[in-house]
Amino acid sequence: MRLRNKPWAQKLVAEHPEVILNEPDPDKKINWEERFEDFSKPLAIEIGSGKGQFITTLAKEHPEMNFIGVELQTTAAGMILRTKLEEKIDNLQLMCADAANIAMYLPENSVDIVYLNFSDPWPKTRHEKRRLTYKSFLDKYRQILKPEGHLEFKTDNRGLFEYSLVSLNNYGMKFDYVSLDLHHADDEIFERNVETEYEHKFAAKGNPIYCLHAHFVK
């Protein structure tokens, strides 16, 4: 869902290039060693961070890791940035960028976890290539993930979940976890689950939350 444009968010993003990259040039290498205090820590990225509840919570809970939130909308990115600055979340960097270029922004084999949370389902067939679990996006995740890295995906959209199961399977990925109702799963994955804004809203209405974890076979 596109948020209404907030001029303050654009201004805030422009004022803090040290912690948020705004539409970076895909052809220009990003020096992540300079942007993080210790880039040798395990790295997780969330593609489509929305207002940032998931990525900011996770970063605060895991100071032993680094996190990158990728969000295309400037207003949403500004909201995440505001939280990061107010709560002094030092192990979080942000990008206001198109996920289609993600493999050009990050070094090969540098990421431990890719999070896809409540992505736009793009239900029309002609928009299939825009889905974040389409094969061309899987190509990019494979490039940036470490050999032992994995992908975690959550959605309330049954159609997108079924599509993603087929897409990942056809790509040759192996599933480590699949749930058709995460919030009623009595397991470790639910116990450590961090909710997004959308997830909290959908789950409160009684909607099932679909979840999968998968890895590439090298």
Curated annotation (Swiss-Prot):
UniProt keyword list: Methyltransferase, S-adenosyl-L-methionine, Transferase, tRNA processing
Family: Belongs to the class I-like SAM-binding methyltransferase superfamily. TrmB family.
Name listed for the protein in its UniProt record: tRNA (guanine-N(7)-)-methyltransferase
EC number: 2.1.1.33
Region of interest called Interaction with RNA, as start-end residue ranges on this chain: 126-131
GO cellular component, one term: tRNA methyltransferase complex
HAMAP family xref list: tRNA_methyltr_TrmB
Positions in coiled-coil regions: none
